[in-house]
Amino acid sequence: VKDVSLKIHQGEILGIGGLAGQGKLGIPNGIMGLFPSGGEIIFEGKSLPLNNTLEAQKNGISFVSEDRRGVGLLLDESIDWNITFNAMQIQERFIKPYLGGLIKFRDDKAMKECADKYIDELEIRCINEKQLARNLSGGNQQKVCLAKAFAMKPRLLFVSEPTRGIDIGAKKLVLDALKKYNEENNTTIVIIS
Protein backbone atom coordinates (compact mmCIF):
# COMPACT_ATOMS: atom_id res chain seq x y z
CA VAL A 1 0.00 0.00 0.00
CA LYS A 2 1.43 3.38 -0.99
CA ASP A 3 0.29 6.95 -0.54
CA VAL A 4 -2.82 6.17 1.51
CA SER A 5 -4.35 8.91 3.59
CA LEU A 6 -7.44 8.24 5.69
CA LYS A 7 -9.37 10.49 8.01
CA ILE A 8 -11.71 8.43 10.13
CA HIS A 9 -14.10 10.06 12.57
CA GLN A 10 -14.80 8.79 16.06
CA GLY A 11 -17.73 6.40 16.17
CA GLU A 12 -17.66 5.74 12.43
CA ILE A 13 -17.83 2.29 10.85
CA LEU A 14 -15.67 2.23 7.72
CA GLY A 15 -15.26 -0.58 5.23
CA ILE A 16 -12.13 -1.19 3.16
CA GLY A 17 -12.70 -3.65 0.34
CA GLY A 18 -10.69 -5.06 -2.49
CA LEU A 19 -9.36 -8.13 -4.20
CA ALA A 20 -7.05 -10.56 -2.44
CA GLY A 21 -3.43 -9.46 -2.55
CA GLN A 22 -4.20 -5.78 -3.12
CA GLY A 23 -2.68 -4.68 0.21
CA LYS A 24 -5.77 -3.64 2.11
CA LEU A 25 -4.44 -5.37 5.24
CA GLY A 26 -1.27 -3.28 5.03
CA ILE A 27 -2.98 -0.50 6.98
CA PRO A 28 -3.84 -2.40 10.19
CA ASN A 29 -0.82 -4.70 9.89
CA GLY A 30 1.49 -1.68 9.68
CA ILE A 31 -0.18 0.17 12.53
CA MET A 32 -0.13 -2.93 14.73
CA GLY A 33 3.45 -3.88 13.91
CA LEU A 34 2.66 -7.11 12.09
CA PHE A 35 4.33 -5.96 8.84
CA PRO A 36 7.12 -3.40 8.44
CA SER A 37 5.69 -0.08 7.34
CA GLY A 38 6.48 3.58 6.99
CA GLY A 39 4.47 6.72 7.32
CA GLU A 40 2.63 8.40 10.12
CA ILE A 41 -0.47 7.76 12.17
CA ILE A 42 -2.17 10.53 14.07
CA PHE A 43 -4.69 9.10 16.52
CA GLU A 44 -6.75 11.41 18.72
CA GLY A 45 -4.35 14.25 17.89
CA LYS A 46 -1.27 12.27 18.94
CA SER A 47 1.44 10.87 16.68
CA LEU A 48 1.91 7.15 17.26
CA PRO A 49 4.87 5.02 16.21
CA LEU A 50 4.23 2.48 13.48
CA ASN A 51 5.39 -1.13 13.80
CA ASN A 52 4.71 -1.15 17.54
CA THR A 53 1.91 -3.45 18.70
CA LEU A 54 2.25 -2.53 22.36
CA GLU A 55 2.04 1.22 21.76
CA ALA A 56 -0.95 0.80 19.46
CA GLN A 57 -2.78 -1.26 22.08
CA LYS A 58 -1.82 1.06 24.94
CA ASN A 59 -3.33 3.90 22.92
CA GLY A 60 -6.66 2.15 22.39
CA ILE A 61 -6.17 0.47 19.01
CA SER A 62 -6.98 -3.22 18.56
CA PHE A 63 -7.00 -5.57 15.59
CA VAL A 64 -8.94 -8.78 15.03
CA SER A 65 -7.01 -10.59 12.30
CA GLU A 66 -8.49 -13.13 9.93
CA ASP A 67 -5.50 -15.28 10.96
CA ARG A 68 -7.03 -16.25 14.29
CA ARG A 69 -4.72 -19.22 14.74
CA GLY A 70 -1.58 -17.26 13.85
CA VAL A 71 -2.06 -14.00 15.73
CA GLY A 72 -5.46 -14.13 17.38
CA LEU A 73 -5.62 -17.06 19.74
CA LEU A 74 -3.57 -18.78 22.38
CA LEU A 75 -4.71 -22.23 21.25
CA ASP A 76 -3.48 -24.10 24.31
CA GLU A 77 -5.09 -21.69 26.77
CA SER A 78 -8.63 -21.41 28.08
CA ILE A 79 -11.32 -19.15 26.67
CA ASP A 80 -11.21 -16.85 29.71
CA TRP A 81 -7.43 -16.52 29.44
CA ASN A 82 -7.70 -15.73 25.71
CA ILE A 83 -10.33 -13.06 26.29
CA THR A 84 -8.59 -11.31 29.19
CA PHE A 85 -4.85 -11.86 28.62
CA ASN A 86 -4.09 -8.74 26.55
CA ALA A 87 -6.14 -6.48 28.83
CA MET A 88 -4.34 -7.97 31.82
CA GLN A 89 -0.85 -7.55 30.37
CA ILE A 90 -1.26 -4.19 28.65
CA GLN A 91 -3.88 -2.37 30.72
CA GLU A 92 -3.38 -4.13 34.07
CA ARG A 93 -7.06 -5.06 34.16
CA PHE A 94 -8.21 -8.30 35.80
CA ILE A 95 -5.45 -7.88 38.39
CA LYS A 96 -5.72 -7.47 42.16
CA PRO A 97 -2.95 -5.48 43.84
CA TYR A 98 -1.82 -6.41 47.36
CA LEU A 99 0.51 -4.67 49.79
CA GLY A 100 0.11 -1.33 48.07
CA GLY A 101 0.72 -2.82 44.65
CA LEU A 102 3.97 -4.61 45.54
CA ILE A 103 2.33 -7.91 44.71
CA LYS A 104 -0.27 -8.47 42.02
CA PHE A 105 -2.45 -11.49 41.41
CA ARG A 106 -4.89 -12.40 38.69
CA ASP A 107 -8.46 -11.55 39.54
CA ASP A 108 -10.00 -14.89 38.57
CA LYS A 109 -13.50 -13.72 39.50
CA ALA A 110 -13.27 -10.66 37.21
CA MET A 111 -11.77 -12.82 34.43
CA LYS A 112 -14.67 -15.27 34.72
CA GLU A 113 -17.26 -12.47 34.73
CA CYS A 114 -15.76 -10.92 31.60
CA ALA A 115 -15.48 -14.27 29.81
CA ASP A 116 -19.03 -15.28 30.78
CA LYS A 117 -20.36 -11.93 29.54
CA TYR A 118 -18.86 -12.41 26.08
CA ILE A 119 -19.63 -16.14 25.95
CA ASP A 120 -23.26 -15.16 26.49
CA GLU A 121 -23.37 -12.07 24.24
CA LEU A 122 -21.51 -13.69 21.35
CA GLU A 123 -23.10 -17.11 21.86
CA ILE A 124 -19.73 -18.85 22.02
CA ARG A 125 -20.57 -22.55 22.06
CA CYS A 126 -18.38 -24.14 24.70
CA ILE A 127 -18.46 -26.30 27.81
CA ASN A 128 -17.43 -23.37 30.01
CA GLU A 129 -14.89 -20.56 30.14
CA LYS A 130 -12.10 -23.03 30.96
CA GLN A 131 -12.36 -24.93 27.66
CA LEU A 132 -9.21 -24.70 25.54
CA ALA A 133 -9.47 -22.46 22.48
CA ARG A 134 -8.08 -25.20 20.21
CA ASN A 135 -11.16 -27.34 20.94
CA LEU A 136 -13.62 -24.75 19.62
CA SER A 137 -15.00 -24.59 16.09
CA GLY A 138 -13.55 -21.97 13.75
CA GLY A 139 -16.60 -19.75 14.18
CA ASN A 140 -16.39 -19.90 17.96
CA GLN A 141 -12.66 -19.20 17.80
CA GLN A 142 -13.46 -16.08 15.75
CA LYS A 143 -15.96 -14.99 18.41
CA VAL A 144 -13.28 -15.43 21.11
CA CYS A 145 -10.96 -13.17 19.08
CA LEU A 146 -13.71 -10.56 18.92
CA ALA A 147 -14.33 -10.88 22.68
CA LYS A 148 -10.59 -10.47 23.27
CA ALA A 149 -10.66 -7.20 21.32
CA PHE A 150 -13.81 -5.97 23.11
CA ALA A 151 -12.20 -6.73 26.50
CA MET A 152 -9.44 -4.25 25.59
CA LYS A 153 -12.12 -1.52 25.28
CA PRO A 154 -10.58 -0.11 22.09
CA ARG A 155 -11.42 3.29 20.70
CA LEU A 156 -10.32 2.15 17.24
CA LEU A 157 -10.90 -1.44 16.18
CA PHE A 158 -9.66 -2.96 12.93
CA VAL A 159 -11.39 -6.20 11.93
CA SER A 160 -10.20 -8.30 9.00
CA GLU A 161 -12.69 -10.64 7.33
CA PRO A 162 -14.83 -10.92 10.49
CA THR A 163 -17.17 -13.52 9.01
CA ARG A 164 -14.72 -15.69 7.07
CA GLY A 165 -15.11 -19.39 7.76
CA ILE A 166 -18.16 -19.16 10.01
CA ASP A 167 -21.73 -20.30 9.46
CA ILE A 168 -24.47 -17.96 8.28
CA GLY A 169 -26.11 -17.59 11.71
CA ALA A 170 -22.79 -16.74 13.33
CA LYS A 171 -22.06 -14.20 10.56
CA LYS A 172 -25.13 -12.17 11.49
CA LEU A 173 -24.30 -12.44 15.18
CA VAL A 174 -20.71 -11.21 14.64
CA LEU A 175 -21.80 -8.27 12.48
CA ASP A 176 -24.57 -7.36 14.95
CA ALA A 177 -22.04 -7.55 17.82
CA LEU A 178 -19.70 -5.16 16.00
CA LYS A 179 -22.55 -2.72 15.35
CA LYS A 180 -23.74 -2.94 18.96
CA TYR A 181 -20.21 -2.40 20.29
CA ASN A 182 -19.84 0.63 18.02
CA GLU A 183 -23.14 2.13 19.17
CA GLU A 184 -22.63 1.49 22.89
CA ASN A 185 -18.99 2.62 23.07
CA ASN A 186 -18.68 5.13 20.20
CA THR A 187 -15.79 2.99 18.98
CA THR A 188 -14.48 3.57 15.48
CA ILE A 189 -14.51 0.28 13.57
CA VAL A 190 -12.69 -0.37 10.31
CA ILE A 191 -13.76 -3.59 8.60
CA ILE A 192 -11.43 -4.98 5.94
CA SER A 193 -12.89 -7.45 3.47
PLM region spans:
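Glycine-rich phosphate-binding loops of nucleotide-dependent enzymes
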Residues: 1-193
